[in-house]
Amino acid sequence: MFDAIDAALADIKAGKAVVVVDDENRENEGDLICAAQFATPALVNFMAVEARGLICLAMTGDRLDELDLPLMVSKNTDSNQTAFTVSIDAAPHLGVTTGISAEDRARTIQIAINPVTRPEDLSRPGHIFPLRAKTGGVLKRAGHTEAAVDLSRLAGLYPAGVICEIQNADGSMARLPELVEYARKYDLKLISIADLISYRLQHDRFVQRETICEFPSQFGEFKLYAYRNLLDQTEHIAIVKGDPSEFGQQPVMVRMHSECLTGDALGSLRCDCRMQLQAALKMLENHGLGVVVYLRQEGRGIGLVNKLKAYSLQDLGYDTVEANERLGFPADLRDYGMGAQMLNDLGVKQIRLITNNPRKIAGLKGYGLEIVERVPLLIEANDYNSHYLTTKAEKLGHWLVKNYLLAIAIKFTPNVASAQQRYEKLEKIRALLQGTPLMVHEDNRPVAIALFGKNSLIFHVGLDQNLPSGQPWQKHDHSPYPALVKDFLVQLKQWPDLQALAFLIAQGKDPMETLQVSLDRENVSFADLTADALNQWQPQTVYTYSKQGSGEMTNR
């Protein structure tokens, strides 16, 4: 479907435009891009008539500073952080009249990139919209702005590009099927930003490995790889389990973790960052191979002081997203270019990504890494972070259990006592549910242990989507969930070391928060754990199935 980057660079160098597509989970659009030095009146007119979007001039920050072109706004609230400067026309003494004609806009572009042009040679505002590209290009930000500058630079031309969003004739945004046809119709090369990132990853780097050291921890034996970002001199680390020489031969379990001083170091209960970090390290130790990439982007990218200001607003009743927006920031300012280069340095090709955040998947796909599996990371809520976790699920789209189906406790022979043993079992349980919408969430709360017993592996099965309305889910005729749960339980009871299995039906809400003072209990044998039994189960009853039939989950 997509053309090779080398072929696109040849066309850029020859003065032609190319169609550039970003990730479907980002802007999900295609832009027509050409090198700025080849922006003729005819090409500008083609963009205006056949692409129909806003015509912009992507330039380096250094050149925009020379021209004294500040950002259009001091606080950018655009979700993709597109960095518009004030708009411009070439000054009248340079031959521009209204500024809007194709000839005037082409002339303004040529004046802007001319090294002898001074700030007073440009009128403000105008009809060309300069965009400030991030230093580091698409390796720093996977946007069309950076792609335009990178393509021009890689083609050996002046590092500036003209871009225009491609719209359909009816004014709607052209998506990939329309963009494929558009490129075919006008004989244009079609490339993706993901491929451009991969191309640059093969040819240049902005990450430098500084040192490696042993890292014994309470979670296991690891190695720390320290890196420096050569663009901004920030320091980051990779916490590595196993031999990196083996990373290129198999999918590697990876966690991208952004620094959280209050959570990671100070144990804050307002977020789940520390619990996520610790859970990820335990998973790596159990798996024996993997990486936690620890990125220095505090407060989802807004910095420590601004994060604390957001906390102050949360104290007044705002949620985490509203607080960021109140301060003039998007909900999430993080980017994963540095982390992608660190993984590339370690030889990682395929990723089993530990995340609940769809933006991380979109961001890493944009950096040329193949994500073969998403491994959920579900964290226990507390009185302080429960609203925070709910907001992440509802407003940031995180994959967290929103609706609980049942709580399960399993007793094994011998007992599963250590953290490593629990994670081994949970990995096998997650594997049983792979390919289904069902999610697993371990529960270590005292109320769950009191209910099921301290030697039990306790977890919830639930969904990150809404339950069908009407009947209880286990009796719903047109819902897929009863059959999925039946199959899951039947597979569980076949494990040879499983002694007893107990569960409590839920109807969406966390069953540990809706327990009655007195619960019914039914103890039966594994032989009675059939597909038909599900229809008879009731809430507020603990059902225990065992090989012997006594079923009591003892050893409390």
UniProtKB/Swiss-Prot annotation:
It comes from the Bacteria. Mg(2+) 2 binds at E27, H144. It holds the Pfam family DHBP_synthase. Keywords: GTP-binding, Hydrolase, Lyase, Magnesium, Manganese, Metal-binding, Multifunctional enzyme, Nucleotide-binding, Riboflavin biosynthesis, Zinc. Its cofactor is Mg(2+); Mn(2+); Zn(2+). Residues 203-402 are annotated as: GTP cyclohydrolase II. The active site is at D332 (proton acceptor), R334 (nucleophile). One of its GO terms (cellular component) is cytosol. GTP binds at R255, M256, H257, S258, E259, Q276, E298, G299, R300, T320, T355, K360. Residues 403-556 are annotated as: Unknown. Pathway: Cofactor biosynthesis; riboflavin biosynthesis; 2-hydroxy-3-oxobutyl phosphate from D-ribulose 5-phosphate: step 1/1; Cofactor biosynthesis; riboflavin biosynthesis; 5-amino-6-(D-ribitylamino)uracil from GTP: step 1/4. The record marks H127, E165 as: Essential for DHBP synthase activity. CDD domains: GTP_cyclohydro2. Mg(2+) 1 binds at E27. GO terms for biological process: riboflavin biosynthetic process. Residues 1-202 are annotated as: DHBP synthase. Its EC number is 4.1.99.12, 3.5.4.25. Transmembrane segments: none annotated. It catalyses: D-ribulose 5-phosphate = (2S)-2-hydroxy-3-oxobutyl phosphate + formate + H(+); GTP + 4 H2O = 2,5-diamino-6-hydroxy-4-(5-phosphoribosylamino)-pyrimidine + formate + 2 phosphate + 3 H(+). D-ribulose 5-phosphate binds at R26, E27, D31, R141, A142, G143, H144, T145, E165. In the N-terminal section; belongs to the DHBP synthase family. In the central section; belongs to the GTP cyclohydrolase II family. This is Riboflavin biosynthesis protein RibBA.
